């Protein structure tokens, strides 16, 4: 999976198409990520004593990575990303449009 925590992404498909946000959490096993303020769902919760009140809670649901594109920090555009090895053997991600190293 090429998206990591704290990456800025653009939603390219689905009900929130066109929205941007930051990746809060990645689920590599299922190829899904949580993006701040995107794909909001409502969950009804019961009261649990005095510690937790009943009500409708709005939270983010995971999105599949195929519906997202990384926003390149250098060219400020949604970009396809690839990986390459540097001379010291370290693997890094790079933007395929501007050819700049992302991390």
Curated annotation (Swiss-Prot):
Species: Dehalococcoides mccartyi (strain ATCC BAA-2266 / KCTC 15142 / 195)
Protein keywords: Ribonucleoprotein, Ribosomal protein, RNA-binding, rRNA-binding
Lineage of the organism: Bacteria, Bacillati, Chloroflexota, Dehalococcoidia, Dehalococcoidales
Protein family: Belongs to the universal ribosomal protein uL24 family.
InterPro entries named among the record's database cross-references: KOW, Rib_uL2_dom2, Ribosomal_uL24, Ribosomal_uL24_CS, Ribosomal_uL24_KOW, Translation_prot_SH3-like_sf
GO BP terms, alphabetized: translation
GO molecular function, one term: rRNA binding
Free-text function comment from the UniProt entry: One of two assembly initiator proteins, it binds directly to the 5'-end of the 23S rRNA, where it nucleates assembly of the 50S subunit.
SUPFAM superfamilies to which the protein is assigned, alphabetical: Translation proteins SH3-like domain
GO cellular component, one term: ribosome
Keyword set includes Endoplasmic reticulum: no
PANTHER family, per database record: MITOCHONDRIAL RIBOSOMAL PROTEIN L24
Name of protein: Large ribosomal subunit protein uL24
